[in-house]
Amino acid sequence: MAFTSALTKHVPFSSPLLRDAGYIDGVWTSGDATKTFDVLNPATGELLASLPDMGAAETRAAIDAAHAAQPGWAARPARERSAILRKWFDLMVANADELAAILTAEMGKPFPEARGEILYAAAYIEWYAEEAKRIYGETIPAPSDDKRMIVIRQPVGVVGTITPWNFPAAMITRKIAPALAVGCTVVSKPAEQTPLTAIALAVLAEQAGIPAGVFNVIVGVDGPAIGRELCGNEKVRKISFTGSTEVGRILMRQCADQIKKVSLELGGNAPFIVFDDADLDAAVEGAIASKYRNAGQTCVCANRLYVQSNVYDAFAAKLAAKVAEMSVGDGFKPGVVIGPLIDEQGLAKVEDHVSDALAKGAKVLTGGKRIDGAGTFFTPTVLTGVARGMKVAREETFGPVAPLFRFETVEDVIAQANDTEFGLAAYFYAGDLKKVWRVAEALEYGMIGINTGLMSSETAPFGGIKQSGLGREGSRHGADDYLEMKYLCIGGV
């Protein structure tokens, strides 16, 4: 049986959202796969499902299907593409509870948080359903009276998307919605830890009327082989990837020979700064929202918390008191706010970062250890006495650990915050308006949260600078990377 009782106790076995196959050219198929791979619940270690282990051959077939379907999809009036996307959005909202149950089962985040992700993911489809009708060109004043100069924008073509496990719904729709809206077709490779959510989204896309070949899903564990095919196949004209900076570099190199368009949303290591004129209670709430959402497994979560010296102890005490009250456990249990780490590798990294900090002089205010028993759980943690030489200062922890650094001056903390190869997101809490402007302009990051710990929205451009990536997702700018600009010069008029 492809699906086990560990999954069907949360999602009915008869649910149309459960498919044990990839989706190529409008057909649910195992392709030529001779092996399967397992999908596990990280909260319990239980087997949820076994899926076909697809590879380069199936990816090539999906690319061929997308390439054949792309001209017809692009030729459809924007209003038609918009209507289909809107129907997909409606189906996601109508099936939000079932989608959230699938997501919680395979990824582990608490069910209310998973449901929030589903609605957030759907919002990108709704947004780009509207933006599909607003892909405008422009006219240019000609240098002579017998010419007319026009710029039009056309879809780039076939797009390959590679998405991570930490937001298995939102990372997919944030890429696919703008691509489909402007007339591109897509081959999607979800993370092998969380393929069931992607499959469920494809089921609803099919129900919404997205034609065969327009949206394809490849499931499998051989990410390098699938990635090489997507990057090396000349029919694919764009790659969009969310994941580690290390893998992003590899994909960028593989795309270089064909000068393929690339969008990359990579690592973070976000600073979270608390100045002495901040509202400390609000800063604590913002830190919790930013740091502990999804058990700290987000690329934009606060990774380094800098607190000005004269409020350091007060902030640390307030934060530790709140964090100590957090309930950790299976995401399906009521009241749980911190779920598991995605796997043993993720848990081991968190343990290593905490051990390294303690060995170098840091202190634990609360938490600091894994939770014994089934699942990959780590207690929500607050560390004080943290210094630059520790791993928590240089690497993304990707776990529920808040290391508190002490600083004295604005200049000092700006230098520390910018002392990283990354530049995705940063946060700070302050009261003085002049300071707010100066700090926001000085921080070398693509997104800045000011007096808030949450800033992601389908209406805003998401993306980083430095080695945190290229391009933007969301907002009216999010469609740009899926379009080519074409200049038309008409003479003799």
Predicted features, each with a name:
Residues G137-A282, F407:
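Rossmann-like NAD(P) dinucleotide-binding subdomain of oxidoreductase/dehydrogenase enzymes
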Residues E246-A387, I450, G492:
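ALDH superfamily catalytic-core signature
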Residues G45, A66, R81, L103, ...:
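Residue-level signal for inorganic ion chemistry
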Residues L48-M54, A69-A75, T161, F272-F275, ...:
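Short, well-ordered beta-strand elements within core beta-sheets of diverse protein domains
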Residues M1-S50, A83, K87, I135-I162, ...:
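Terminal low-complexity tails and localization/encapsulation signals of metabolic enzymes
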Residues T185-V187, V364, M447:
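A short hydrophobic/small-residue beta-strand
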Residues E46-I135, D146:
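Glycine-rich loop-to-alpha-helix module at the N-terminal edge of alpha/beta enzyme cores
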Residues T44-S50, V236, I273, S327-G331, ...:
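Conserved C-terminal structural/oligomerization subdomain of aldehyde/semialdehyde dehydrogenase
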